């Protein structure tokens, strides 16, 4: 064997090794400096352990060969095991928990699942933009902190349905982030210091343990909350809790679930926030690149909402992000160790047990690959035509192979969206134009001290921005659209021959594509179908029918359910495939240049060499730049179907009888519940917006259109037919051991207005027909007490009966609440149903004048979601939560209801002044009054004076329709006087917390208007009306009939 060379490096000192060669605050920079001094491979000694660093593309290419090397958990990552244990990132090679978790979680990060997360990603991205817009262009923005908030909120919402609301809670970072930053920094430091030094740092160790306990406790709480309140969603948290390993059949232990929750919360946001921060740093340093990027975003996305389909059409944004990660890989190293002693670079021996760190900030600037300007920011080199020509393993910021980043697609989609959205929304500038890049190190890297200013483009205001959906479009995902059977677009139906589909799929994408293709071919007459994983085709490929294969490559290898099939083809032991007719469709991602389409190509070639007949040219879909389903449809039309017709159904075959395509015939009727109420008409939601900021009780604006005219006037009402909240329905189902689709039929007549002799699902019954939240009656309490065998619970129920007003009615305790509290009660479902009133309509005031926007109406309402007064979970308002659940295009059922005659505008608005007094959503009818006055003015009619007194918490939280009212005020339609309970010293509130106080500041004006026969309208709670009346009577004397109230 050729003599091996020793690995160079700085000379270590006894005991401390190379500790003094390392800057403990900037350890990475110290290592990079050594790389420039000692060359492509060097070593140092830390804590008595030899650490080897590789810094060239050639060495990286060798080290990424998974047949020779595998991941090693060393240094700071090993110290991080105190927190994340055997989670996906910190697990040792071959650790059993890693295998179980990896196989369970792979489908959760497939391309289709990531696409489905786009809307939630957009939600958080919009929050960032709203914050920057409202802060104004003079605000200095700590871009790293804001991107940290963004990425942590995104991973929590998209994968676990949990809102951290980091932009609203305070200026401080979320406690999880504070703990994470400490743990990451401490893990890195502990990995550098000698063991004896770490033992002496008792306070630091205790602080580390405290932060670890806090983070694992937060993860445990997420688990407990989801188990206590299950949600029927296909998210990561449910996958962690309920998923089963397809090989062993095992689920994950709670300890492993907690470790992986922490792994995702850290890895899912820390490196992505760094990527975004570095990307915007480089953009502001390179104005020509910034301008080209913005032009690409403007051209592709236009003025409408950004959709997930746009992202694949932004190649320059993609290149910018890749170049940013090349120069500043936010996870700056990963470590491997050899399976057996290996010679590296032809001259260095790497022994078993040695660890080699791939030092990415140097590897990815290798001048032999990227040229003499490798240290410069040049996005063009990352455009596909150049990127695809790079040597293998030249760009590795996401790690390697099976231990590479499982969430790469998630992070990339999120970052693409944020870059595009920010560029389209803002003009950006560095706060300090002379800022020099500094690096903040933990186990990851970020810019240190980099701040920007953001100005809305095109002179747009923050209010205008918030009134438009700036990000997400409701573009349908092909994976979830419905395919209606039928002979569409004149396509010919093929014959009734059988067909077999085989797929190879780890993440579920190729399986979904296979089922989509099978469904479309079903409509063409291929009704005898077999769909199975590729491994089931070993020694089982049919010869009397077409075989369609859809598969992909996973880290250069077959998917788990295709390994046996590929090995069978490669072994040469497979029999001749003469008579097999097949077609292959392959999926891939262009960033894996070395293995792009490797397995689909291999299967196609091996089957052909074994004698099988190709039906069609191999199809291909690139997940990086195209829509997989659209590519599949094109391949089906242009390649597969022509091949099938030619090979299986010759034109002269007289025995060929085309199957009649399946025609789907349906009828659609109104819900049965609608027919049980009088005069309900159908309305369609046309606009939705939230009127408040987090921190204030939520209030919403809902607009809808109805067919035909009505006789409604400003001040009138609408009856709304709601449904019960899904969580309340789930509680009722669970109490009576019913599945949602259990069928219930009422055979006998009953006093309740329920469907007779017609099956209704249990979920529909509890959702649409019964008042589940109605407070229990005294008789209900007596009946419950009579059915319990427990003397103790019987006495408690009778005590509630005796204290009914204070303990039941005042606390809104329902029969369902009591059944959950008193578990010994054995109440039949028939009795439960008989106890409950029928679900009734709810009444809301119109908040839009009927003539203001013909055929359109709106409601302004508070969403009631608060801790239950009886201490049992949360109390959800039935109608308000129903209205809050509606989406654009949703159908609801309403009926007009006139208000009392007095609660309308005076017939002559020219001479009759009005005074309107309200708080919160009590503004609704007065908004319709003011709009009607605006229409009156537009007819060149004079208007008498109008005053609006409006109370809320603060201008930032819940000053409803502020800008709109300001426009009406500027037009002379109304004068507005505000009171702010949280900020009474605000200049608009004149020191007043509540509207009754604000009335006193306008005493003279009110008295003058009263003398001119003004009408006073009040809309709000009973307490508000009482306080207002007391003030007005002290000011005006007896109010008589010109004082009109509407209490809710």
Swiss-Prot record:
Source domain of life: Eukaryota
Cofactor binding description: Binds 1 FAD. Binds 1 FMN.
Reactions it catalyzes: 2 oxidized [cytochrome P450] + NADPH = 2 reduced [cytochrome P450] + NADP(+) + H(+); an organic molecule + reduced [NADPH--hemoprotein reductase] + O2 = an alcohol + oxidized [NADPH--hemoprotein reductase] + H2O + H(+); dodecanoate + reduced [NADPH--hemoprotein reductase] + O2 = 5-hydroxydodecanoate + oxidized [NADPH--hemoprotein reductase] + H2O + H(+); tetradecanoate + reduced [NADPH--hemoprotein reductase] + O2 = 7-hydroxytetradecanoate + oxidized [NADPH--hemoprotein reductase] + H2O + H(+)
Domain FAD-binding FR-type, residue spans: 678-906
E.C. designation(s): 1.14.14.1, 1.6.2.4
Disulfide-bonded cysteines: none
Keywords: Electron transport, FAD, Flavoprotein, FMN, Heme, Iron, Metal-binding, Monooxygenase, NADP, Oxidoreductase, Transport
Function: Self-sufficient cytochrome P450 monooxygenase that catalyzes the regioselective in-chain hydroxylation of alkanes, fatty alcohols, and fatty acids at the omega-7 position. Performs hydroxylation of C10-C16 n-alkanes and C12 and C14 fatty alcohols; and thereby enables the one step biocatalytic synthesis of rare alcohols such as 5-dodecanol and 7-tetradecanol. Converts 1-dodecanol into 1,5-dodecanediol as major product with very little sub-terminally hydroxylated products with the 1,4-dodecanediol and 1,6-dodecanediol more abundant.
Descriptive protein name: Self-sufficient cytochrome P450 monooxygenase CYP505E4
Species the sequence originates in: Penicillium expansum
């Amino acid at each position: 064997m050729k003599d091996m060379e020793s690995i160079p490096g700085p000379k270590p000192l006894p005991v401390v090794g190379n500790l003094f060669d390392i800057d403990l605050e900037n350890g990475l920079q110290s290592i990079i400096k050594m790389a420039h001094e000692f060359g492509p491979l060097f070593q140092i000694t830390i804590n008595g352990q030899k650490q080897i660093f590789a810094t060239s593309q050639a060495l990286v290419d060798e080290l990424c060969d998974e047949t020779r090397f595998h991941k090693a958990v060393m240094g700071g990552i090993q110290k991080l095991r105190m927190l994340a244990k055997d989670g996906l990132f910190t697990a040792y090679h071959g650790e059993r928990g890693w295998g179980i978790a990896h196989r369970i979680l792979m489908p959760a990060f497939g391309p289709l699942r990531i696409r489905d997360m786009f809307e939630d990603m957009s939600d958080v991205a919009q929050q960032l933009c709203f914050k920057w817009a409202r802060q104004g262009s003079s605000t200095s923005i700590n871009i790293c902190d804001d991107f940290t908030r963004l990425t942590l909120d995104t991973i929590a919402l998209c994968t676990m349905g949990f809102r951290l609301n980091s932009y609203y809670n305070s200026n401080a970072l979320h406690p999880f982030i504070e703990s994470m930053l400490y743990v990451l920094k401490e893990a890195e430091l502990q990995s550098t210091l000698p063991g004896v030094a770490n033992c002496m740092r008792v306070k630091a160790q205790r602080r580390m343990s405290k932060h670890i306990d806090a983070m694992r406790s937060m993860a445990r709480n997420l688990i407990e909350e989801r188990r206590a309140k299950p949600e029927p969603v296909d998210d990561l948290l449910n996958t962690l809790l309920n998923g089963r390993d397809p090989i062993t059949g095992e689920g994950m232990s709670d300890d492993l679930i907690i470790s992986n929750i922490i792994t995702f919360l850290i890895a899912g946001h820390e490196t992505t926030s760094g990527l975004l921060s570095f990307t915007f740093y480089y953009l502001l340093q390179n104005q020509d690149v910034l301008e080209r990027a913005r032009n690409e975003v403007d051209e592709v996305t236009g003025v409408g909402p950004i959709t997930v389909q746009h992202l694949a059409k932004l190649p320059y944004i993609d290149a910018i992000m890749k170049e940013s990660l090349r120069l500043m890989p936010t996870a700056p190293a990963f470590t491997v160790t050899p399976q057996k002693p290996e010679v590296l670079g032809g001259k260095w021996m790497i022994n078993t047990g040695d660890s080699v760190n791939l030092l990415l900030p140097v590897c990815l600037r290798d001048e032999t690959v990227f040229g003499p300007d490798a240290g410069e920011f040049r996005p063009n080199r990352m455009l596909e035509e150049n990127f695809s020509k790079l040597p293998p393993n030249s760009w590795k910021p996401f790690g390697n192979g099976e231990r590479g980043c499982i969430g790469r697609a998630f992070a990339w989609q999120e970052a693409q969206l944020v870059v595009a959205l920010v560029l389209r929304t803002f003009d950006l500038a560095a706060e300090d134009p002379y800022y020099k890049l500094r690096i903040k190190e933990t186990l990851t890297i970020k810019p240190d001290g980099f701040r920007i200013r953001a100005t809305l483009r095109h002179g747009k205001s923050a209010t205008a921005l918030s009134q438009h959906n700036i990000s997400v479009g409701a573009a349908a995902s092909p994976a979830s659209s419905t395919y209606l059977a039928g002979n569409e677009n004149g396509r010919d139906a093929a014959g009734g021959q059988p067909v077999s589909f085989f797929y190879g799929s780890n993440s579920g994408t190729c399986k979904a594509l296979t089922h989509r293709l099978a469904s479309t071919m079903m409509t063409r007459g291929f009704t005898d179908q077999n769909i199975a994983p590729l491994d089931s085709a070993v020694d089982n490929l049919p010869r009397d029918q077409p075989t369609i294969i859809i598969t992909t490559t996973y880290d250069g290898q077959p998917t788990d359910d295709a390994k046996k099939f590929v090995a069978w083809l490669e072994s040469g032991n497979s029999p001749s495939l003469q008579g097999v007719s097949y077609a292959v469709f392959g999926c891939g991602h262009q960033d894996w240049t070395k293995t792009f389409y490797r397995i689909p190509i291999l299967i196609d070639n091996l089957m052909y060499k074994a004698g099988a007949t190709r039906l069609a040219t191999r199809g291909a879909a690139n997940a990086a730049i195209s829509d997989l389903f659209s590519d599949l449809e094109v391949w089906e039309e242009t390649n597969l179907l022509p091949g099938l017709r030619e090979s299986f159904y010759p034109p002269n075959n007289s025995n060929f009888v085309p199957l009649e395509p399946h025609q789907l015939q349906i009828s659609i009727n109104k819900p049965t519940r609608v027919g049980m109420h009088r005069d309900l008409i159908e309305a369609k939601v046309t606009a939705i917006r939230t009127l408040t900021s987090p921190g204030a009780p939520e209030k919403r604006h809902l607009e809808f259109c109805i067919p035909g005219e009505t006789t409604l006037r400003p001040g009138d009402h609408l009856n709304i037919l709601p449904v019960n909240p899904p969580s309340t329905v789930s509680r009722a189902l669970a109490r009576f051991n019913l599945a949602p689709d259990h069928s219930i039929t009422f055979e006998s007549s009953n006093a309740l207005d329920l469907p007779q002799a017609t099956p209704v699902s249990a979920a529909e019954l509890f959702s649409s027909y019964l008042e589940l939240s109605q407070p229990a009656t005294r008789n209900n309490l007596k009946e419950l007490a009579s059915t319990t065998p427990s003397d103790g619970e019987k006495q408690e129920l009778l005590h509630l009966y005796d204290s009914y007003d204070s303990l039941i009615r005042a606390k809104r305790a329902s029969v369902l609440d009591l059944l959950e509290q008193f578990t010994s009660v054995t109440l039949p479902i028939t009795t439960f149903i008989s106890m409950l009133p029928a679900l009734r309509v709810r009444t809301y005031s119109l908040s839009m004048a009927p003539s203001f926007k013909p055929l359109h109406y709106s409601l302004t309402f508070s969403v009631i979601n608060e801790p239950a007064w009886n201490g049992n979970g949360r109390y959800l308002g039935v109608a308000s939560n129903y209205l809050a659940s509606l989406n654009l295009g949703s159908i609801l059922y309403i009926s007009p209801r006139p208000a009392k005659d007095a609660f309308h505008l005076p017939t002559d608005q020219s001479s009759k002044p009005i005074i309107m007094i309200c708080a919160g959503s009590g503004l609704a009818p007065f908004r319709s009054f003011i709009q009607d006055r605006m229409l009156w003015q537009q007819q060149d009619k004079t208007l008498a004076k109008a005053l609006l007194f409006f109370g809320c918490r603060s201008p930032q939280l819940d000053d409803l329709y502020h800008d709109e009212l300001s426009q009406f005020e500027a037009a002379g339609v109304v004068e507005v006087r505000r009171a702010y309970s949280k900020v009474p010293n605000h200049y608009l509130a004149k020191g007043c917390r509540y509207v009754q106080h604000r009335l006193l500041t306008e005493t003279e004006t009110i008295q003058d208007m009263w003398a001119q026969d003004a009408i006073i309208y009040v809309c709000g709670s009973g307490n508000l009306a009482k306080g207002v009346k007391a003030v007005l009577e002290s000011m005006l004397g007896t109010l008589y009939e010109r004082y009109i109230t509407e209490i809710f």
